[in-house]
Amino acid sequence: MLTASDVTGLLALPPSPLAARGEELTEEYSLDLDEATRLADQMIRDGVSAIGLCGTTGECATLLWDEKVALYSAVIDTVAGRVPVWCGTTALGTREVVREMRAVKDMGAAAAFVGLPLWQTPTMDNAVGFFADLAEAVPDLPVMVYANRFFFKFDFPVEFWARIAAEAPTVIATKVGFPLTQEHLDVAGKQVNFMTGEGTIGLQYRMAPESVTAAWATSAAMGPEPWVAFLGAHARGD
């Protein structure tokens, strides 16, 4: 099972390619799986280290579960173990998230990519308890916290990460969508890989270069080479 130290290189967060008439409400199926698998293969050949499916850009909030199953299965089969595949399982409630996590684990996902349930604004206890419940229910699947404070109506403060490190052992990484500070790294950096992305990786590098082992990029679908080069140079001490 992956740990925080295994999270290295560039995590690509591509869109989920739409079929020619996929936006039509009369269509029962919206995805172009041939393009999804072609894109996954191309990104691997261009140097990405992991692929994360069905984040925001990947239409996590709009695809049907049957469509996600087809997408995950097709991409995991195409990737064939060359890089880890992280599958989005954000949903409206914990029971559904657990069901989806168990399903993607059986498909061969390396980890789940999970945001807080999109319904009521969470308290601190709600937010921590949610990820603690996931660790108890699915103890053999790592979790990346989708920590976007605007989408999930929660600021992901230092206290949250201190409690996550103590109460949610399957959380190994986060897609940072909040102002990262040294204090976040101090309270949870050993368990959780704090991954910044396109707009903030330079800030993290200047603040705590030793903490930068990985980064995320939605723009990787247009060519990941700049981010692959940045992370490679950092790894070489260049």
Residue ranges and their predicted role:
Residues E136-P142, N148-D238:
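Catalytic alpha/beta core domains of metabolic enzymes, predominantly
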Residues L2-K153:
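Active-site beta->alpha loop and helix N-cap motifs at the rims of alpha/beta catalytic domains
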